[in-house]
Amino acid sequence: MSRLKKLYTEEIRKTLQDKFQYENVMQIPVLKKIVISMGLAEAAKDKNLFQSHLEELAVISGQKPLVTRAKNSIAGFKLREGQGIGAKVTLRGIRMYDFMDRFCNIVSPRIRDFRGFSCKGDGRGCYSLGLDDQQIFPEVDLDRVKRSQGMNITWVTTAQTDAECLTLLECMGLRFKKAQ
């Protein structure tokens, strides 16, 4: 069992139960999945660059990314239908908890001038953030990076409100800015 999964079952569930006074244990929020996505529209013109970003995403996440393709052709953007324009990975289970543990304890402190993430969720129990650079992940070989590439990370939970979601993620180790 993952260290973070064990922490969730032994401590975090009790903390959430005490704070939000759930009537049923099934109401306690759970982390369902983590989605990591990259928009690679500029890199789509260069196949080697596109492939290197796919490899970096695979190394970061631990599984092969799914290439997202264009639905329509748009001449103004020089985009053809079926052309690869991005990549995404959906993490569940043990890989999800391992990624969350690494992200909170290793990656977040490596972000320059890091003072915490924004406290704004989507209002339905999900939290998303954007990173400007993939080089903060220790798995990425800096000598092989051809171009800096950002990514979006979304945490999907069973929480009903932002407060529940942010409390769950904060208990798991994600650091947020203090409210002023």
UniProtKB/Swiss-Prot annotation:
Keywords: Ribonucleoprotein, Ribosomal protein, RNA-binding, rRNA-binding, tRNA-binding. It comes from the Bacteria. InterPro entries: Ribosomal_uL5, Ribosomal_uL5_bac-type, Ribosomal_uL5_C, Ribosomal_uL5_CS, Ribosomal_uL5_dom_sf, Ribosomal_uL5_N. PROSITE patterns: RIBOSOMAL_L5. GO terms for cellular component: ribonucleoprotein complex; ribosome. This is one of the proteins that bind and probably mediate the attachment of the 5S RNA into the large ribosomal subunit, where it forms part of the central protuberance. In the 70S ribosome it contacts protein S13 of the 30S subunit (bridge B1b), connecting the 2 subunits; this bridge is implicated in subunit movement. Contacts the P site tRNA; the 5S rRNA and some of its associated proteins might help stabilize positioning of ribosome-bound tRNAs. This is Large ribosomal subunit protein uL5.
